[in-house]
Swiss-Prot record:
One of its GO terms (molecular function) is ion channel regulator activity. It comes from the Eukaryota. Residues 1-6 form a propeptide. Disulfide bonds join C14-C31, C19-C41, C21-C46. The lineage of its organism: Eukaryota, Metazoa, Spiralia, Lophotrochozoa, Mollusca. This is Conotoxin Cal9.2b.
Length: 52
């Protein structure tokens, strides 16, 4: 994975069932529903807990 993140450990930052999106204009993850658009996310992806 490329990019710099502000996470200080490897715990998944979102609730179960949500996914982590890294906005193009931010270095901190936001959580969103897996059905939400990923157009504003780095790599156009929202990372699920399974893929974290």
């Amino acid at each position: 994975k490329k990019g710099v993140t502000l996470r200080e450990d490897d715990r998944f930052p979102c609730n179960a069932g949500n996914c982590a999106c890294l906005p193009l204009d931010s270095y901190s993850y936001t959580c969103q529903s897996p059905t939400s658009s990923t157009a504003n996310c780095e790599g156009n992806e929202c990372v699920s807990e399974a893929d974290w």
